[in-house]
Amino acid sequence: TADEALVFSDGEDIGITYTLSDDGKLVISGTGSIADDAFAGNTKITSVVISEGVTGIGSGAFTGCTNLTSVTIPEGVTTIDGMTFGNCTSLTSVTIPGTVTSIEVQAFWNCSSLTSITIPASVTSIGSGVFQGCTSLTSVKLSEGLTRIGDQTFGRCNALETIEIPASLTSIGNDAFKNCAKLRSIRCYANSSTWQPRYICD
């Protein structure tokens, strides 16, 4: 078959294996973390299922997988690293589990087909540019527990019309909603008395 198998190891006998089927479904199993840039630029991949036991996803692991449409991330993963799914322009669906605590810089940058995202209550920090250039994003749910939004986190989200900011938020970066042309309503439950206009949008 066209199935492939590969083992990544961090030198401590922690291995990750994968199978890639003819229809582009990538199934990842084992224990430990997926290596940085492990599948970067692989245009054969159309869907990713990560099994429980995997605890980390390396920086840029799936960046530029332009035919990837859906991703399932298991309970146990705590961080989505920088540029993990950056420039996955066909990605429409991603499930973020309740064990993730941080989403790092540009993790979903330029995922231009992504239409909605739910950030679970476990996430306390969303890095700079995480959803920048997600031009089809219309629905975002930010849960209570989130404390930080980075610079330009939702920059160029041209389809985003409304968003609610939870009371737990204490820090918001510059131009968090820069160039969100259709954004008409920001409902803020946090104490925003010290925030300047540049923190939100231009």
Question: What are these language model-derived features?
Answer:
Residues T1-A5, K178, I186:
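Short intrinsically disordered, low-complexity coil segments enriched in acidic
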Residues A2, Q196-D202:
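Membrane-proximal C-terminal cap and juxtamembrane stalk of leucine-rich repeat ectodomains
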Residues G11-E12, G24-K25, G82, D151:
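Intrinsic-disorder/low-complexity loop/linker signature
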Residues D13, S33-G41, C201:
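A composition-driven surface/loop motif
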Residues T1-I16, D22:
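Low-complexity, acidic Ser/Thr/Pro-rich repeat tracts that form intrinsically disordered stalk/linker regions
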Residues D37, G58-T63, D81-G86, E104-W109, ...:
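Consensus positions within tandem repeat domains that build extended binding/scaffold surfaces
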Residues T17-Y18, D202:
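A general structural signal for short secondary-structure junctions and capping/turn motifs
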Residues S21-G32, T43-G56, T66-T79, T89-S102, ...:
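Structural signature of tandem-repeat unit edges
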